[in-house]
Amino acid sequence: MAQQQGMDSALFERRLRPVYDNLEVGNNRKALQESEKLLRKHPNLLCARALKGLSLLRLGRYDESHGCLQTVAEEKPTDDSTLQVLSFCYREMEQLDKIVELYQHAVKQNPGNEELLAHLFISHVRVEDYKAQQAVALQLYKAQPKNAYYFWSVISVVFQGIRGPESALPEKRKIYLGLAQRMVDKHIKEGKMETEQEAFLYLHILKLQNKYQEAWEFLTGELCAKLYPGAPVSMKFELLKELGNWRELNELLQQLLDADRDRWDFYKEYIQSSFELLKLTPQGVENGDKDSLARCQEFLQRIIDSSERKKRGPYLARLELHQRMRAEQLPAEKLIGDFDEMVIEYFRLFGDKSCCTHDIALFLPSISMNQRQALASKLLLESGVTSTSLPKNKEQLQKHLCALQISRMCGSHMDLPADHLLAFYTALKLHYEHGRTTFGKKLLATEMGPSDAYALLAANVMYDLSRRENKSDHLFEALCLLQYVLRNSTSNFHVKLLSLKIYHLFGCQVGAQEMYEYLDIKQIQLDSMGYVHCQLLALGGRFSGNRNVYDATLKFFTNSYKERLEYIALTYRFCTFSKMEEFMNFKERLTNSLQYVACSVEAQICDLVSCYGNITQNLSAYVAMSIEPAEDRIAWHELSDNRDLGAIIRWDPLHEVDAAEERRESFDQEVEVLQVRSLMLRLFASFIDLYHGAGLKDSPAGAETATLELLRESWTGLFQRLRVMNYKPLAQKFLVNLLPTRLHLLLDMPYERFFDDLAQLVLDLQSGSAKLAEQCKRVGDNVIATMELCVQTINESNESNGIDGLWKRRGQQQKVAASLEMLSLYAFLLSVLNDKLQVSSKTKTKKKPVENKVDGPQPISEKERSQMLQELMRQLKHKFEACDTAIRSWKAPVLPRDLSSFMSDMSLKPEVEATLIGDVSATFKDSHELMVTELRNLLKDKIRMVAK
């Protein structure tokens, strides 16, 4: 240590530089060599030892790294370089509490050191210890009276009130927020408030206490005007609404809308304030409604008339006012005009914009079905395109598209007979091809084709037909059309998403994977958009292939977790109080993301199912998973649904779509699926730990057995509850609807009985129960039933190939995959049990037998248990061979019609049709062959595993 402190600073930095440089470029082996070289000359150089630990960590030599870092930490370093390297290591290992300990020791040795105290504060921020944050912030303020440190203590008090352990108690929340307000009040009286972020924090504290009048007075006062001139207008809206000051809000919004005439959010607030003013009008006053709403209508009309360029905002506001008045049973038509005429006027002005469909759809729910369909017919006439004409320019094409989309949303297509739907589909294809060849030339690679939406609409129409007939041919044709569009518009993500959905619907994982990769989903999209692929992969038939997708997703979550912590730390460093809660909420949503938790569980199950090494390698892989059967690590009540369900564009009939209900139902079912999968993983882990848990965990004798029995009880209880809940499969009425979850598959397959009987077998084997033979037979019967289900499903798939090989394909693949999953886990368990019994019997043969004169039933001998286990393994081997034979005979899906029939329907160029349909068909064939190869390789590994 003395050598380190005495070393010249420049020399110190120069000698460490090669290590830093190599670590920065990822040359970890060279960094290790350089650090060891430096340590030979300076063995007490703590920073070099810490860098050696970091190099070892990056090389994956975790045990050596841990020992090296532990040695350095025990020296209780105080120099910044060593502390920073150690902190970096502990952040990578997610051992954030150790960073706190490091800086606590350093601060004890240098109590007044501002830099060390600041690092200690940030280390408390990372572990969300708000009380400790407050104490350290006050220490900092005493050492260096800076505003930043004072407000660190204020925000720490605020977070104790709204996020801390006592935040659920109203009286505690009140105390903490009151304290925070008094702290800031004191600072204001002393004239020490200096920045806009400090002003924001004060306003936030007042709003949290519902002190809206005080907040308004501060916001409109001199100090706030000086420090926070850029306070968002929304803050004024919020306060005026809470105070019920609708008149002032109305006047403020008029001023803002005069300045910015296209702010739809402002218009909605303005209309709301007008209706609130109407409520305040005394009942005895005549024409009170006219005074308030007439002024609103006049204001909107004045903006429309005086605007040089036509903007959507005021026209939408007028439609919103009309809709609100009708909802309140006020004379909207008398005051504003005919609703249909206003929509048609809007369509004339803005129908050439792609957003027009969504805009008009906002107001359709307020009119009857007959009115909707009548309006849709008027819009089609207004577009100027008939059944015998084509759009003359891009603008007319977009208007026609908008009218068709609105027509579908009004339900005009749902009752058409099949031949009319086919004719409509043909017309949509022709419109697409005309638009592509006429208006879609010389587009940039990033542009979507102007007529692409025709093909998207056509795909939806063909799904309606396929569902009506329960046949796949129409939907397969739609898939071919979408692939054709994708060749022409490579950046159209709507086409990719629909293609991905159809591939999954048909159980074609290769095609789905291609589309998923083509989407190029990255970063936060892996959470918000990953559901379109990841949630549909499990039990699809490709265990090892799925693992790669899970790895890419999980890598984002683990890497971004560290980044999210640093974002929060940066908001403290720069005192950006307005962003703190936003970043914290973001961190919590990602940490508790259903996508993240589900991928983690499925990845571990995939690993256990796919184990192919010897028993030692398999157990090492299992131990590395760090599964704790006794501990449920999932915060079930905090799981977050981060899916962007609006990403897939839809124009389905509004009266048959309930997006909120669909989201709720699918989320509830996905959580139940996660419950089953997580509990299955923990239950299976308890089987392994019962035999190979000794030495791995510090637990009292009998704890593993108790854990197993508790988990077994939870397992059967979960299935009983799920059957009582009686969940219905997700509706599949439209192409955009989410595919059914695996919940009903898990309930229909013999998961419950299979693992329940396995639990009893494991317990009987351990105790040598007299009922072991009976239990072995029960488990053997389960294996036979599961194998027969697998073979039967494959036979059914082969038989249905003559009629329609695609329509039920996904469900058939899931049944086969689920059967093999259960049998593969069973094989892994048998190999573990067999290994343990063999080791145990060898140990006991060396000991002399002891006479046992105790009365009562005696445990079955180790030898007999081993023989029974060997018989189970032989039986399983034969069943695996039977499954392998069946899978080898599994035929690729045959299309319901021949390719020439499809080509005649496609109505595209002959040379395009041949390659297009051939490529899509080849994708299905490749997917089947790859799945069969993977499943057969899995079975070969399992046959080898149990052939002992």
Swiss-Prot record:
UniProt keyword annotation of Flavoprotein present: no
Q: In which tissues is it expressed?
A: Expressed in the fat body after immune challenge.
Does this entry carry the keyword Iron?
no
- Localization per Swiss-Prot or TrEMBL: Lysosome
Residue ranges for the region (Disordered) are 841-862
InterPro entries for this protein: NAA25_NatB_aux_su (IPR019183), TPR-like_helical_dom_sf (IPR011990)
Q: Which UniProt keywords apply?
A: Antimicrobial, Immunity, Innate immunity, Lysosome, Repeat, TPR repeat
For this record, the Gene Ontology CC terms, alphabetical, are: cytoplasm; growth cone lamellipodium; lysosome; NatB complex; neuron projection
Where is it predominantly found? other
Q: Domain of life of the organism in this record?
A: Eukaryota
Cited Pfam families:
NatB_MDM20
Q: Where are the TPR repeats?
A: 46-79, 80-113, 523-560
Q: How does it assemble?
A: Component of the N-terminal acetyltransferase B (NatB) complex.
Q: Which family does it belong to?
A: Belongs to the MDM20/NAA25 family.
Instruction: From the Swiss-Prot or TrEMBL record, give the protein name.
Output: Phagocyte signaling-impaired protein
- Organism whose genome encodes this protein: Drosophila melanogaster (Fruit fly)
